């Protein structure tokens, strides 16, 4: 046996057997490059997932409350300036519209309602509008709310915190090294400053990544450890979708296996964080979507910002088929009747009912 092969097997043995071990950056690279068997990675990742989240999966539902009109130039985004993506632009929805969206999300079994607005960041007036909406949703529906509204200072974060916001999303998206390749209208440092502001206000930090934008394995490993240094409690892992109008020069090739390995990496580096399968799940994970839940404990359903996704019934069925259960905001479990029976309803499969007696 070669010295290199022996070292690789010893690394796999360590990750497999030492439940409380903390992986190094080198071990992270070996997870991504295939040196460690996928089943070994999943076994270790599942042990950590199960330790903190048991067999529960949290479903998040996005509400794109303002689309387009963005002055930023993030290369991955259909809403970026000069994108010519053909998306339907609209100003911020009214409080009543957003509230009704939240009502529907709760009916669908959402653990958290995620409000997303385009733009560099909210001004004072917009912050107050958002705070009013958040206050109503949390008080009247008892829902957990996450807001993604761009760059934020501590003063505005305090306003949102006072309204009941317990989670703010601001993705780092890629490594500091790779950031100039994807955006030139703001800096990586400005994004980390927003995380600092959110933390100082006492709001839980949600920050994640987009993989597949031409970054290296080292960049992905660096991102996982950077988020660990910020003690981020919720990490959405997006898989790049080449939407019309994007400006990513050399998108990477993402196989379903690599996507699962990436989720394992983020779980092993951030064992007690909520790891969420985000945009690109349907197209990149494909038949391994259910397998990915052995590393991740959360996912989005019912679509993304400008891309369709799996509907809630399909998502819930996949979760249950894999032996997991959808977790509700009160810690309970989504009732069984919202699953397979609805999936095979007459509306969805009329051919199954064509001989039904009237």
UniProtKB/Swiss-Prot annotation:
What does the entry list as the binding residues for [2Fe-2S] cluster? 114, 146, 206, 276
Keywords of the record, alphabetical order, are: 2Fe-2S, 4Fe-4S, Biotin biosynthesis, Iron, Iron-sulfur, Metal-binding, S-adenosyl-L-methionine, Transferase
Q: Radical SAM core domain: from which residue to which, for each copy?
A: 55-278
GO biological process entries: biotin biosynthetic process
Domain of life, per UniProt, equals: Bacteria
Q: Which GO terms describe its molecular function?
A: 2 iron, 2 sulfur cluster binding; 4 iron, 4 sulfur cluster binding; biotin synthase activity; iron ion binding
State the PROSITE patterns in the record: RADICAL_SAM
Binding of [4Fe-4S] cluster, residues: 70, 74, 77
Cofactor(s) this protein requires: [4Fe-4S] cluster; [2Fe-2S] cluster
A Pfam family of this chain: Radical_SAM
Pathway(s): Cofactor biosynthesis; biotin biosynthesis; biotin from 7,8-diaminononanoate: step 2/2
The annotated subunit structure for this chain is: Homodimer.
Q: What is this protein called?
A: Biotin synthase
């Amino acid at each position: 046996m070669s010295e290199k092969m022996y070292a690789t097997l010893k690394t796999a043995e360590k990750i497999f057997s030492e439940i409380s071990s903390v992986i190094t950056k080198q071990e992270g690279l070996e997870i991504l490059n295939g040196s460690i068997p996928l089943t070994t990675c999943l076994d270790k990742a599942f042990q950590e997932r199960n330790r903190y989240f048991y067999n529960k999966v949290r479903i998040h539902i996005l509400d794109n409350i303002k689309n387009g009109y963005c002055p930023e130039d993030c290369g991955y985004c259909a809403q970026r300036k000069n994108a010519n993506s053909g998306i339907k632009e609209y100003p911020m929805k009214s409080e009543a519209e957003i509230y009704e969206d939240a009502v529907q999300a709760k009916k669908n079994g959402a653990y958290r309602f995620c409000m997303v607005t385009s733009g560099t960041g909210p001004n004072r007036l917009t912050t107050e509008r958002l705070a009013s909406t958040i206050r109503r949703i949390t008080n009247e529906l008892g829902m957990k709310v996450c807001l993604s509204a761009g760059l934020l200072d501590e003063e505005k974060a305090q306003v949102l915190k006072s309204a009941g916001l317990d989670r703010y999303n601001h993705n780092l998206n890629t490594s500091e090294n790779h950031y100039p390749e994807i955006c030139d209208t703001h800096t990586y440092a400005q994004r980390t400053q927003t995380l600092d502001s959110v933390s100082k206000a006492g709001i839980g930090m949600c920050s994640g990544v987009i993989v597949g934008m031409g970054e290296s394995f080292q960049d992905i490993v660096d991102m996982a450890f950077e988020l660990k240094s910020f003690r981020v409690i919720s990490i959405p892992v997006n898989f790049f979708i080449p939407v019309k109008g994007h400006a990513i020069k050399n998108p990477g090739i993402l196989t379903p296996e690599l996507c699962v390995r990436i989720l394992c990496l983020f779980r092993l580096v951030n064992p007690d964080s909520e790891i969420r399968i985000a945009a690109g799940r349907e197209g990149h994970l494909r038949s391994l979507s259910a397998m990915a839940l052995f590393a991740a404990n959360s996912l989005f359903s019912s679509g993304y910002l400008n891309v369709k996704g799996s509907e809630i019934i399909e998502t819930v069925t996949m979760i249950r088929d894999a032996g997991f259960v959808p977790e509700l905001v009160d810690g309970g479990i989504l009732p069984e009747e919202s699953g397979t029976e609805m999936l095979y309803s007459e509306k969805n499969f009329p051919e199954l009912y064509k001989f039904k007696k009237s």
